[in-house]
Structure formats: structure tokens, C-alpha cells
């Protein structure tokens, strides 16, 4: 076959396969058999392999998955991916309608209602009609680049029907039938199954190997335009129509409503129809349709005033409580957990539910053998709502909390003003294991690849008992563990080695000193600069620090007044673990050349590691100015958790937005 003929045939096959994909995955109306589709795809793959000069980034063959990635790169969203306020009942919907009408002086308002897909929110960027990048929502400001995995989803067009530059947003999901098939395969292979389709979709789309994502048969509904060049669309419903014309898959079950009564009827209708869909939904999204009215209504500190998400009521089911299991946390708190006959709740098989503490068991008169009502709090955490007393037979057993720790047999105590029972044995194995999990966590030593499963393996193999033991681990030891190969063992040893360079505040937080969170750990690290100086500090010296109270000061002094702790710190020194503060102190900032010099910065939302007052002081010490509102003169918005209206203002004025992690990186340069 000549090059000219090969090129022509490749183009024909691409057009043909793109048409087949659109008919099957967007229109849900296939025109050919799977066998015919596969024959054409294999012919295309063969021709492209023989003629690599004709390979294209938007070829349908890309969808089978490409090169394995090492990491997901971070992506800052051009405009923040904000969350919506919630409605839980008819009254909440009517309140929303009242607020909307008041905000626009009772002008005529039309709503558009859409199914709230229970999947993974993603953004899709197109340049002149070509798909160039896709990202997860992340924290709303910064997500992860998952472009290669999104290319495997056949409902996402690689090239649009117009050469337009835009950003579309939507929800990637796994159809129920694909979820069932995937879990059946996992069970046959002896692997852990996914709890629900949402977890399966999220787990699939974040695979470093795109070939795995390609096999998972994911799909996607696009629900909005975030940015589109040189085009004004007057309503949300028209933007959805436009997205459909471009080749995107939009949900066909949307409806425009003239009154709140019509909205409520739509909600009730889909609450009934919900089980018959081939994908999970967890509510209804209601938006003011007119874009001009949306802009007039604006946003609150947390969410837009022109939209709300109605959340379906938490599903409640009845099952039998077969036992009560106890767990011991890193601080020694003993927590009871109900063991249940397996039951499906909100799309997940539930076998356990929280009982919180002994007082709750007494208050609800929960007994082993009872039939109980179980629901998911916020559709996330299973909990026992109440006992069905009419089903009691007399054979149920009252439950009494033990007097001794289930992990180490030490006597349990109830500290003053505390509801929970606590094990105060510092050598309790359960506390040690949980403490190790905390030590390696993200806000502590942040050791990549070392999570709960691996810590448990290492602990059970008796390789680790103290934090310092982590730094003596060898590749040979790791290779003895299940699921560890040469590469993963080498990577973990290197990650542990890298953690030695962390700044003091991470180590302090990782130690798990009672009452000392990430923010307090940073305060101590910046104030004392070295671990040795903090160890020698008195209670009075600690209390003299701004925002450090008596309880925390006493806890820190008591922690370091312990020979085992001092021995641990000595081991850290011998292993080369850094125990000094590497950040910049406010007193030293005046002499530093900084990005912030001359910049106007706005802080919004909750900053976890560094409080807003401390962040303000540091920015000002670096020559920046912190203001309370976003305007055209603002250079940067730093957004923490629950950031709201200021993000919308940043988008309006085209102001750069950083999350806290990016902000801290710049401060510590």
C-alpha cells in the first residue's frame, strides 16, 4: 500500500470510528456491531503503526491508552470550580426561590433542573476545537492533569465540530452495568472490590496507566461552559444545546421550569425514577437559566446565589446488628463500631457503622441481636439511627464496654470532662500502629507510597515499632511484603530518605503530641527554630506564644518530659532526620527578594497550616499588601477551604488564584 493510499484510508477509518463512537456513547444509538467496530479499530491501529508519520493526537486509537505516567502534574484552574449550596427538603427549595425572586425584584425567572451525577468532576480544555488538557476538580483551585486517561473515555470528543477555544465542565462516571462487571472480574481475581460506582470511576480515572482506565468503560456528561472565546450565550439551557452541537454528551433528562412547584415536581419525579437509571445520581441541580440574572444575583461567601443542589434524603435501611467491635485510635480513645449483616445503603454494601461512644449505646439502648435502622450521614459515613424495638425477641444481649484495652489489656480510664474511654498505655500496639499511620500522613512527614495498608504490613512483620524504625527499613525487607516489587520497594526507600529533609513543623505534627495540630506545630517550629530549643521550653514560655493555651503548653511539656521520647529524638538525629525550621521567619523577611513585593493579595477561606493572620503578617513583611476585597488592582488571591465569592470575583477580574500549598511553596523559597 502506497503512503498516499495509507493516509487516505487512515483518515477514512478515523472519520468512521469517530461517527461510531458518537452514535454509541453520546446518542446511545449504535449503528454497527461490536465486531465490526473492533475490525475497523484494529485496521486503524495497524496502519498507524506502519505509518507513524500520519499519527495524530486526536485519533480514535488514542482511546485504548498510552504510556504509563510517573505522576499526575498539578493544574491551576483558569476559573475556580466552585461548589453549590445544598437543599434537603421542599422548604429549602422554596426558600431558595424566595431569595432568588427578592434578588431580582420579582422579575420573571425560569429555572433549569438537571440530574446531579454521582461521579468525578472534571474540566476539559479545547483549543481551536482540539482537546488539549483535562483535569480533576481537586480543591476547586488546583486539580491534577488527567488528560491521557480522559482521552480513553469515548463520550469525550477529541475534536469538536467547530474550531472553538473553550473550557467545558462535567462529571465522569461509571455506568452501573460496567461497575457490576468490573467487580465480578475483581472477585474472580481475588482482588478487593469497589464500594460503589463513584469510587470505581475516581479510582479508574486516577490510574497512572491509561490502559487500565481504557478498560473500565467510563462515560461522561458535560454540564456547563466555564470559558468560551468570542461567543455570548444568553442562557444555561442554550449553552447545553450548544455543547451538544459541538459533540459533547449532555444529559437528556434536564427540564426548564417556570415555577418552584414545577421544580419540586421534577425533584419528586426523579426521586422515584432514580433506581431505573444506568448511572448513580445523588440529587438535582437547580439553576436560574438566564445568564444575565445569574450575574445580577452574584454569589455569597460560599456559593452562587443563582444555583442550589437538592440532595436526596439519606437512604435508610433495616438490618441486624450482630456484634460490637472496638478500635483503639492513636490517642488511645476506644471507639465502638457496630457489626451488621451486610446491607446496601446509598449504593454501597455496608457491614459496619459508627456507634461513637458508650453513652450513645446507652441512650439508644442498642443491644447485640437488635434490628436497627442504618443510614449514611451525608451519604458518606454509615451510622445506626435507632433500634426497632418491635422486632425484639428477648434474646438480645446488652452491651457493656470493657474495663481493659482490647489491644493491650491495660486498664481503660475516662479522663475528666471526656465521654470516651481511653487507653493510656504508651506501648499499646494499636496506638503505635495508628500513630505510625499519622506520622507518614500528608500534613506530617508526607511519605509517598506509605499509607495504612503498608504500615500495617510493616507492623505485622515486626519491622517497625517506633517512628525512627522507618528510617532503618531496607529494600530487602520491603521485598518480603505482599505487592512489593523491585521498583516499588526502591521508590519507597527513596521517599523515606527524602522525608529526612522536611522542615521541623512536619516532624512535630507527625509526633502526634496531644492538642498540637498542624498550625500549632508550625507556630512552635517558627518560634523555637530547633527541636532542642522546644524540648527545653517551660510551660510559661510556651503560653507566652500567641494562640498557645494552657492545655497545649502542659501537653507539650509532658510529652518531652519522657525518656522514651528523648531516646526517639536521639535516634532521629543519628538517622539524619532534620530537626530545624526551614521556613522563613517574619523578622527575616525584610531582607528577602520576594514575589510578594509590591503585590496586592487577598486571602479567602480557611488556611489549614498557616492562619490568615499569620499569612497576612508574612506577606506584608515581604513587601506585599493584603486587602479584604478583590478588584482590578488585585494581583493574587490565596484560597483555602470553603472559599467562595472572592473566587468568583477573581474569575471576573482575571486574577491569579493559588491554593494554600502553592502559597507555602512560594513563602518557603
Swiss-Prot record:
NAD(+) binds at residues 34-38, 83-84, 114, 137, 171, 287, 311. PROSITE patterns: BRCT (PS50172), DNA_LIGASE_N1 (PS01055), DNA_LIGASE_N2 (PS01056). Residues 591-669 form the BRCT domain. SUPFAM superfamilies: BRCT domain, DNA ligase/mRNA capping enzyme, catalytic domain, Nucleic acid-binding proteins, RuvA domain 2-like. One of its GO terms (molecular function) is metal ion binding. Zn(2+) binds at residues 405, 408, 423, 428. Keywords: DNA damage, DNA repair, DNA replication, Ligase, Magnesium, Manganese, Metal-binding, NAD, Zinc. It is an enzyme of class 6 (ligase). The keyword DNA repair applies. Its cofactor is Mg(2+); Mn(2+). GO terms for cellular component: cytosol. One of its GO terms (biological process) is DNA replication. DNA ligase that catalyzes the formation of phosphodiester linkages between 5'-phosphoryl and 3'-hydroxyl groups in double-stranded DNA using NAD as a coenzyme and as the energy source for the reaction. It is essential for DNA replication and repair of damaged DNA. Belongs to the NAD-dependent DNA ligase family. LigA subfamily. This is DNA ligase. The gene is ligA.
Amino acid at each position: 500500500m502506497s503512503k498516499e493510499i495509507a493516509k487516505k484510508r487512515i483518515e477514512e477509518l478515523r472519520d468512521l470510528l469517530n461517527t461510531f463512537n458518537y452514535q454509541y456513547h453520546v446518542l446511545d444509538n449504535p449503528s454497527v456491531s461490536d465486531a465490526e467496530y473492533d475490525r475497523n479499530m484494529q485496521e486503524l491501529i495497524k496502519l498507524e503503526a506502519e505509518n507513524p508519520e500520519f499519527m495524530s493526537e486526536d485519533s480514535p486509537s488514542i482511546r485504548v491508552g498510552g504510556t504509563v505516567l510517573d505522576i499526575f502534574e498539578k493544574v491551576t484552574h483558569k476559573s475556580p470550580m466552585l461548589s453549590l449550596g445544598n437543599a434537603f427538603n421542599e422548604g429549602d427549595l422554596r426558600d431558595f426561590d424566595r431569595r432568588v425572586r427578592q434578588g431580582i425584584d420579582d422579575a420573571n425567572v425560569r429555572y433549569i433542573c438537571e440530574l446531579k451525577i454521582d461521579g468525578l468532576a472534571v474540566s476539559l480544555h479545547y483549543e481551536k476545537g482540539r482537546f488539549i488538557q483535562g483535569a480533576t476538580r481537586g480543591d476547586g483551585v488546583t486539580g491534577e492533569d488527567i488528560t491521557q486517561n480522559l482521552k480513553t473515555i469515548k463520550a469525550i470528543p477529541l475534536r469538536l465540530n467547530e474550531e472553538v477555544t473553550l473550557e467545558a465542565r462535567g462529571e465522569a462516571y461509571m455506568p452501573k452495568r460496567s461497575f457490576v462487571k468490573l467487580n465480578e472480574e475483581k472477585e474472580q481475581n481475588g482482588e478487593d472490590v469497589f464500594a460503589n460506582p463513584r469510587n470505581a470511576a475516581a479510582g479508574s480515572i486516577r490510574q497512572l496507566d491509561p490502559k487500565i482506565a481504557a478498560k473500565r468503560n467510563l462515560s461522561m456528561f458535560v454540564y456547563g461552559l466555564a470559558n468560551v472565546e468570542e461567543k455570548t450565550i444568553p442562557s444555561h439551557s442554550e449553552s447545553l444545546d450548544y455543547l451538544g452541537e459541538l459533540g459533547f454528551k449532555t444529559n437528556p433528562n434536564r427540564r426548564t421550569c417556570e415555577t418552584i412547584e414545577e421544580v419540586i415536581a421534577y425533584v419528586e419525579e426523579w426521586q422515584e425514577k432514580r433506581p431505573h437509571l444506568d448511572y448513580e445520581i445523588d440529587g438535582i441541580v437547580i439553576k436560574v437559566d438566564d445568564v444575565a440574572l445569574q450575574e445580577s444575583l452574584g454569589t455569597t461567601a460560599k456559593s452562587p446565589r443563582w444555583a442550589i443542589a437538592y440532595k436526596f434524603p439519606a437512604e435508610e435501611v433495616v438490618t441486624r446488628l450482630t456484634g460490637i467491635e472496638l478500635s483503639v485510635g492513636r490517642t488511645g480513645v476506644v471507639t465502638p463500631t457496630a457489626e451488621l449483616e451486610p446491607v446496601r445503603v446509598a449504593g454501597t454494601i455496608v457491614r459496619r457503622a459508627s456507634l461513637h461512644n458508650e453513652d450513645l449505646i446507652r441512650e439508644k439502648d442498642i443491644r447485640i441481636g437488635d434490628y436497627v435502622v442504618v443510614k449514611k450521614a451525608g451519604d458518606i459515613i454509615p451510622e445506626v439511627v435507632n433500634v426497632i424495638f418491635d422486632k425484639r425477641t428477648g434474646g438480645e444481649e446488652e452491651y457493656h464496654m470493657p474495663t481493659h484495652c482490647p489491644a493491650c489489656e491495660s486498664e481503660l480510664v475516662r479522663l475528666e470532662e471526656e465521654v470516651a474511654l481511653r487507653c493510656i498505655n504508651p506501648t499499646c500496639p494499636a496506638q503505635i500502629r495508628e500513630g505510625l499511620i499519622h506520622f507518614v500522613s500528608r500534613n506530617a512527614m508526607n511519605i509517598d507510597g506509605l499509607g495504612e495498608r503498608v504500615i500495617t504490613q510493616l507492623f505485622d512483620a515486626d519491622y517497625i515499632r517506633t517512628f525512627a524504625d522507618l528510617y532503618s527499613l531496607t529494600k530487602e525487607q520491603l521485598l518480603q511484603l505482599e505487592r512489593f516489587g523491585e521498583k516499588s520497594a526502591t521508590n519507597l526507600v527513596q521517599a523515606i530518605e527524602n522525608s529526612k529533609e522536611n522542615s521541623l513543623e512536619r516532624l512535630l505534627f507527625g509526633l502526634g503530641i496531644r492538642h498540637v495540630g498542624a498550625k500549632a506545630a508550625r507556630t512552635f517550629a517558627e518560634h523555637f527554630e530547633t527541636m532542642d530549643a522546644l524540648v527545653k521550653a517551660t510551660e510559661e514560655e510556651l503560653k507566652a506564644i500567641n494562640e498557645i493555651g494552657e492545655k497545649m503548653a502542659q501537653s507539650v511539656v509532658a510529652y518531652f518530659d519522657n525518656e522514651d521520647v528523648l531516646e526517639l529524638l536521639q535516634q532521629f538525629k543519628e538517622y539524619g532526620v532534620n530537626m530545624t525550621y526551614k521556613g522563613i521567619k517574619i523578622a527575616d523577611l525584610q531582607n528577602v527578594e520576594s514575589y510578594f513585593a509590591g503585590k496586592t493579595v487577598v486571602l479567602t477561606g480557611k488556611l489549614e497550616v498557616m492562619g490568615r493572620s499569620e499569612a497576612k503578617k508574612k506577606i506584608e513583611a515581604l513587601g506585599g499588601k493584603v486587602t479584604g476585597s478583590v478588584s482590578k488592582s488585585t494581583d493574587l488571591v490565596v484560597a483555602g477551604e470553603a472559599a467562595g465569592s472572592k473566587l468568583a470575583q477573581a474569575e471576573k477580574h482575571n486574577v491569579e488564584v493559588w491554593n494554600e500549598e502553592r502559597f507555602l511553596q512560594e513563602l518557603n523559597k
